[in-house]
């Protein structure tokens, strides 16, 4: 199975800061059809994960443009340009290029104390 490694595990930020989360896969996520099926999700407390970004850099419907995804091959990044309170939670990367689909361990975005 493809191993997805996220860093950092915890990301303390102040509101208005930029946040950056990295995701690395154990093998290339470029599909034979040329697409790269790397997705980002946000799970808020008590809720199921919600899709933010699909195929590396495409924002899902309704996702604010302060969220952006980039990367290729095995290395990917999610950036939040100005963190808002509603952005707090656990972020996951996932790949659906290979079977079975696999997820990173999560990055908790929290307020810096």
From Swiss-Prot:
Pfam families the record matches: V-set
Complementarity-determining-1: region residues: 24-39
Region (Framework-4): 103-112
Region (Framework-3): 62-93
Chain spans, region Complementarity-determining-2: 55-61
UniProt cross-references to SMART domains, sorted A to Z: IG, IGv
Domain of life where this protein originates: Eukaryota
PANTHER family: IMMUNOGLOBULIN LIGHT CHAIN (PTHR23267)
Misc. comment: This chain was isolated from an IgG2a hybridoma protein that binds digoxin.
Protein name: Ig kappa chain V-II region 26-10
């Amino acid at each position: 199975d493809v191993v997805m490694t996220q860093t950092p595990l915890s990301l303390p930020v102040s509101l208005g800061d930029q946040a950056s989360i990295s995701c690395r896969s154990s093998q290339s996520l470029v599909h034979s059809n040329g697409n790269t099926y790397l997705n980002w999700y946000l799970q808020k407390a008590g809720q199921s994960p919600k899709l933010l970004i699909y195929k590396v850099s495409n924002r899902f419907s309704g996702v604010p443009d302060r969220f952006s995804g980039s990367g290729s091959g095995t290395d990917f990044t999610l950036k939040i340009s100005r963190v808002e309170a509603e952005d707090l939670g656990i972020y996951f990367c996932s790949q659906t290029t290979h079977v079975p689909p696999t997820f990173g361990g999560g990055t908790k975005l929290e307020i810096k104390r």
